C-alpha cells in the first residue's frame, strides 16, 4: 500500500516546479481524501484510496500538491489542478459517490 502511494507521489511530483521538500503520511480519515499542511510540509493521504481506482489516487495527489502553490480552492487553484489533471471534475464526482 505505502509503496503504491510513494510511487504515485514521486511520479506526479515531477510535474510541479514549486514543491518544497515534503513528507507523505498515509492514514484512515473519515471526512477527507487528502490534506496538505503547508506549515510543516506534510501531505496526508487517506488509506482508503487504495481501494479506489488508481486514477482517483492520482487526482487526490495532484489536488494536494497543488495546495503548495494555492492554499485555498480559488480559480487559480483549480487551474493548477486542471493543468496536470484535466479530468479532475470527473474524479471529484467519483469520490463523492
Feature map (PLM): residue ranges:
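Active-site-proximal or metal-binding-adjacent scaffold patches in catalytic folds
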Residues: 1-59, 68-97
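Walker B catalytic acidic pair
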Residues: 64
Amino acid at each position: 500500500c505505502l509503496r503504491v502511494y510513494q510511487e504515485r507521489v514521486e511520479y506526479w511530483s515531477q510535474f510541479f516546479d514549486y514543491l518544497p521538500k515534503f513528507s507523505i503520511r498515509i492514514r484512515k480519515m473519515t471526512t477527507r481524501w487528502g490534506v496538505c499542511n503547508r506549515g510543516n510540509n506534510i501531505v496526508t493521504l487517506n488509506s482508503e484510496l487504495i481501494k479506489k481506482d488508481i486514477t482517483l489516487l492520482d487526482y487526490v495527489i495532484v489536488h494536494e500538491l497543488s495546495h503548495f502553490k494555492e492554499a485555498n480552492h480559488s480559480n487559480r487553484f483549480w487551474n493548477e489542478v486542471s493543468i496536470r489533471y484535466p479530468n479532475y471534475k470527473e474524479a471529484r464526482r467519483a469520490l463523492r459517490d
